[in-house]
Amino acid sequence: MLRSGYAPSGDQPEAIRRLVEGLNDGELHQTLLGVTGSGKTFTIANVIAQVQRPTLILAHNKTLAAQLYGEMKEFFPENSVEYFVSYYDYYQPEAYVPASDTYIEKDSSLNEHIEQMRLSATKALIERHDTVIVATVSSIYGLGEPASYFEMVLHLVRGDMIDQRTLVRRLAELQYTRNEAELRRGSYRVRGDVIDIYPAESEKEALRVELFDDEIERLSLFDPLTGEVISRIARYTVYPKTHYVTPREKLLEAVEEIKVELKDRLEHLRSQHKLVEAQRLEQRTLFDVEIILEVGYCSGIENYSRFLSGRAPGEPPPTLFDYLPDDALIVIDESHVTVPQIGAMYRGDRSRKETLVEYGFRLPSALDNRPLKFEEFEARAPQRIYVSATPGPYERAHSGAVVEQVVRPTGLVDPEVEVRPASTQVDDLLSEIRFRVQGGERVLVTTLTKRMAEDLTEYLMEHDVAVRYLHSDVDTVERVEIIRDLRLGKFDVLVGINLLREGLDIPEVSLVAILDADKEGFLRSAVSLIQTIGRAARNLHGKAILYADKVTQSMQQAIDETERRRAKQIAYNERHGLTPRGITKSVTDILEVSIPGGSAGSRKQAARVAEPGAGYKVAKPSEAARLIKQLEEKMYAHARDLEFEEAARLRDEIQRIRESALMA
């Protein structure tokens, strides 16, 4: 059920109708060409609501995914809206550098909160049809075999017969750990015939199983922090702690297959007189096998995933796509970036692993622990809609028809584009900036090199212009703060090299200046120019100036496309008597990244209890993970001592740090 205070307008109704019609007609590829500010997300939400199908939305980075997740939560408050991104705060893959004989061990920091959300996403696909999952390209990486995962679930029904020892053994098979001191996600505790389980995919609720004479007498959901019972239930399904669970008999079969491959590989290495590599491989593999037999898993178990899932050599790994129902829909947002990203993942992963195999760090089967190849993604992905203001060649070649959404509901038209000589670009820019600043408007300037951006910033400062320089070293949170300051008028001009990234749609920006627009290359391609020109599309007086001594083919394409859209928008406004109106979003509204785990659309206070928060400033995600772990230990300690106010304060502080870290 779609909830919104707006009705589709402008090009939206026709775009929705055509996309829904295409889906119902079985079209595999469709493209929505939607200009900046035309309400592409709202259109997609309406399509999802009309076709009533499980949907996977792919974004090209975590920040964009978090924004889409927040918007979808607002549009579908009663649906199961989930978030599936990489659960690593920090990840250093295993690698070997032969030139210096350096082995780099795998090092990572897992974000438990995101891991919980990933498990929640696959659970939703199994249990509900009204699921919308927002994911990044990490969804093409290997995940546990769905058949094994489903086989391992534990169904608990009130009145069923099960003894305490059997229940505890089943939880251990699901990789839950026993913890009598504190109940944490993915753990359980036993107190006589009462067993408390904190499901790995649950955000806030734990399960209490009360047995009487080997019968499940009562099932209850309760708050793991306070112990308060929330509700009594008749049945509950406990899902494995991780996607990488395997039944014992399959595990034993896999171990035998690993030993067979090891024997063959050792013979091969010794025949080539690679004795050091052979010894290394034998030692490492037999150690892993021993650990697997003892506890059911080992560090780096994903390298043996081919055997655990029973696949043939070279066969693609199971991924999130294997969990999708047959009638699912895929929406690829910012497809001009996301589609090439999908294709690039496999190649980088392959070259690193081939070195590990060659030098005896891994068995050849480790090569099958990989992301999907692009052709495998194509074969697995169901019907899909590509969404972009500038669709790439792949989308255009595969889509039967491109559905255009050029007219904005606000009546705003694309900015006027002007070409001026590059020889006088700096002085001309200075006079344009002064004119815009007098009107209380802001300016974006994009240069080709870091050196030029720094020099220009220095020059503008010398001429009393309030200017800031946005460079690649600025992290996501700081970047958001810089944009906030620009919107608030703390400075008037933002200089950068690549200002295409999402989040730079700022209504106060009335001028975009592109220096050296005639220098062909990635930053001055037709797609890049159209995207950059679009940054001024949310202002009534929007204008783009391209400084160039000649008009290149890319420039001409960008100018022609902008003029085509502008003409269509003006004609629509005249036909319907529509007066363009500027966007008046508050600074908080447009900058807010709705973080998964919080309530959509509302910025949580850092602390909701009487005590002021400590105001921890987190520089890196890896630091955030360590700090969250420390604070969680303190929180549980306070809860055990019945100091619930202090525990609640720490819980809110953890939530604030988690929000900051997720934006990184």
From Swiss-Prot:
InterPro entries assigned: Helicase/UvrB_N (IPR006935), Helicase_ATP-bd (IPR014001), Helicase_C-like (IPR001650), P-loop_NTPase (IPR027417), UVR_dom (IPR001943), UVR_dom_sf (IPR036876), UvrB (IPR004807), UvrB_inter (IPR041471)
Annotated ranges, domain Helicase ATP-binding: 21-410
Any one GO cellular component localisation term in the record: cytoplasm
Location of the protein in the cell: Cytoplasm
Subunit structure as annotated in this protein's UniProt entry: Forms a heterotetramer with UvrA during the search for lesions. Interacts with UvrC in an incision complex.
Database matches in Gene3D superfamilies: P-loop containing nucleotide triphosphate hydrolases, UVR domain
Molecular function GO terms recorded: ATP binding; ATP hydrolysis activity; DNA binding; excinuclease ABC activity
Source species taxonomy: Bacteria, Pseudomonadati, Pseudomonadota, Gammaproteobacteria, Methylococcales
Function: The UvrABC repair system catalyzes the recognition and processing of DNA lesions. A damage recognition complex composed of 2 UvrA and 2 UvrB subunits scans DNA for abnormalities. Upon binding of the UvrA(2)B(2) complex to a putative damaged site, the DNA wraps around one UvrB monomer. DNA wrap is dependent on ATP binding by UvrB and probably causes local melting of the DNA helix, facilitating insertion of UvrB beta-hairpin between the DNA strands. Then UvrB probes one DNA strand for the presence of a lesion.
Domain (Helicase C-terminal) ranges: 425-578
Pfam families with a match to the protein in the record: Helicase_C, ResIII, UVR, UvrB, UvrB_inter
UniProt binding sites for ATP: G34, V35, T36, G37, S38, G39, K40, T41
Keywords for this protein: ATP-binding, Cytoplasm, DNA damage, DNA excision, DNA repair, Excision nuclease, Nucleotide-binding, SOS response
UVR domain mapped to chain residues: 625-660
Domain notes: The beta-hairpin motif is involved in DNA binding.
Motif Beta-hairpin mapped to chain: 87-110
Name assigned to this protein: UvrABC system protein B
GO terms under biological process: nucleotide-excision repair; SOS response
Homology family: Belongs to the UvrB family.
